[in-house]
Amino acid sequence: MEGSFEIIAKIAIVLIALEHVYILWIEMFAWETAGKKTFRSLPDHIFKPTKGLAANQGLYNGFLAAGLIWSIFIADAQWQRNVAVFFLSCIVIAGIYGAVTASKDIFFKQGLPAAVTLVLVLFTS
């Protein structure tokens, strides 16, 4: 039976995955509506011409979410951990890069939650 620490780590992984599914939705399907509300620092006229670029970013967020969700269903505990560590590390790195190049908020909204979850995963099993 799994310990409570492992259950908390898995719940955190699912929450991080859901966040990235939400980002996918904004960037791929709602860039000109919800995207404008989310990315208020960008001028309104930029959304239509950058729709394709945003969709590409959304697709990458979908890959991150898919990897995290996949990690939950892997039967082998070591592989489950390895896959989760890989995808969480990708998100932490992207959060750091985003904070340096775009907005510090990216780290606090994406990188930090992934880093905390990564620590939880590393301390399980």
Place the predicted regions along the sequence by residue.
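Small-residue-rich segments of transmembrane alpha-helices in multi-pass membrane proteins
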Residues: 113-125
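Interfacial helix-start motif at the membrane-water boundary
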Residues: 46-63
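N-terminal signal-anchor transmembrane alpha helix
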Residues: 8-29
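Membrane-interface helix-boundary signature
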Residues: 2-12, 47-50, 77-84, 103-106
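Cytosolic, membrane-interface loops and tails of multi-pass inner-membrane proteins
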Residues: 28-50
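Mid-chain, well-packed structural core segment of small domains
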Residues: 58-98
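C-terminal structural segments of small proteins and small subunits
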Residues: 86-116
